[in-house]
Amino acid sequence: MPQDPNTTLQMSSSKPSLSDLSVSADPVLGKADNQVRDSLALPSIEGGEEGVMRPLAWLFGLCAIQQASGATLLRNDVSTVEPLPPTQDPWYRAPPGFEKKQPGDVLRIRQAPGNLTTVVSNSSAAFHILFRTTNARSEPAWAVTTLFLPKKLYRAPSRNAALLSFQLADNSANPDSAPSLGLYWRLAQDNPMLGLRSDTSFISNLLSEGWLVNIPDQSGPEAAFGASRQAGHATIDAIRAIQHLCSLTGATGINAAIWGYSGGTFATGAAAELMPTYAPNINIVGAVLGGMVTDVSGGFDSLNRSPIAATIIATLLGVTAQFPEERAYLESRLVPETRDEFMSVLDINVFDALVHFAGRDIYAFFIDGAADIEAPILQNLFEAQSRIGFGDIPPMPMFIYKAIADEVVPIGPTDVTVQRWCDGGADITYERNTVGGHIAEIENGKPRAIQWLWSIFDESYSAQSPECRIRDVTVEVPVQVVGRV
């Protein structure tokens, strides 16, 4: 897609200058100072064929948010040269009084420590943003997102930039497996066994399109994996935080879209359903869901004894992370002799968990087997927190793709959810691939998804008739080492 040659970001003369801004002290991180000009020197960002998008515009955004909402802007020497696990990094703490902020308000910003722009090529800068959100219990909470800036910025005819929020399938109940840290190592590793390249390679490909790319830690600081409301809120509020930065600077408007595959669709689908009531004014103009998961607990039988059986444990611990009564019940039903092994998923990284529990009978960890998981106390929680397809009708256009022979997440529930959304008036293109399975559809669906996203970002998409288009397709991309999503 051709790049717009005029991409220099213009600052409004009414915005505060750097010299007008102050940096607040933070009792957790120590005293910051006003030398932000030196501490946040950013690389130049090429724009289009001849223009240069000046990072000063983004620097103004980082500083302006401090004055507007009390965010704590940190110098590079306050954070670490190399990233620390979130549970050990004092930056991953909300400042006092964050509960009084509004969802999407920025609480902290820093340049991502270490070599993230080297790990993720095609990125000119990367930021960690800590923002106010809402947890699964509808209580004030916070989360972190990682924002990548491309080397060349695409602008739509309206002059808006394109922001793609990609929700990774984090599949972990360990806070230290959050994407903001995982991007440095486990998400930067290829998976030769499955013939898949790293997530960071895929992010680099997205950046090459000229899009801003957002990767939220949608499960939050408690790693509430599988809690759809938590993930949906965090996805929405990460976008709100970025749009808030842009609106403060007057630098650029944003056309935002959301995308997730497999476990990432839980956050993406929840955000789409929550948007009409939780954030009706947010500008999310499109959503893509591949290999869609509609009911986390409904897939336990197919996951049990599979290579990814650990996902069952991560889900049970993640969904109950913010619900003490349900967590207490869950732990009370574990076989004492293997309880510690089950609970170790809270502390080991997701890859080690997958290897350790591959092929295992997870139901055997419970005193009464699967019956303990089917108890009303857990099923009621799953019904309230771990399903999509039962909320509001998503208001944005959607592209949904899935392999008919998906062996990990059967297609039947997806068909039902799509039909419900269609009956409610949603604008959906749903493609059911006649070839491949869950893993193959990662690559088979990617070109179609990107092509559809371009129609959203270049503002050429228009509602079609009928509003829902459901079709079987036969798409097989040649086997190669490809980006894992």
From Swiss-Prot:
Q: In which pathway does it act?
A: Mycotoxin biosynthesis
Q: What else is known?
A: Trichothecenes are sesquiterpenoid toxins that act by inhibiting protein biosynthesis.
Coiled coil ranges: none
Please describe what this protein does. Answer: Probable trichothecene esterase; part of the satratoxin SC1 cluster involved in the biosynthesis of satratoxins, trichothecene mycotoxins that are associated with human food poisonings. Satratoxins are suggested to be made by products of multiple gene clusters (SC1, SC2 and SC3) that encode 21 proteins in all, including polyketide synthases, acetyltransferases, and other enzymes expected to modify the trichothecene skeleton. SC1 encodes 10 proteins, SAT1 to SAT10.
Which key words are in the record?
A: Hydrolase
According to its UniProt entry, one GO biological process term is: lipid catabolic process
- Please state what class of enzyme this protein is: hydrolase
Q: Which residues form the active site?
A: S262, D406, H438
Family classification? Belongs to the AB hydrolase superfamily. Lipase family.
Q: Where is this region: Disordered?
A: 1-23
What name goes with this protein?
Probable trichothecene esterase SAT6
Stated EC number for the protein is: 3.1.1.-
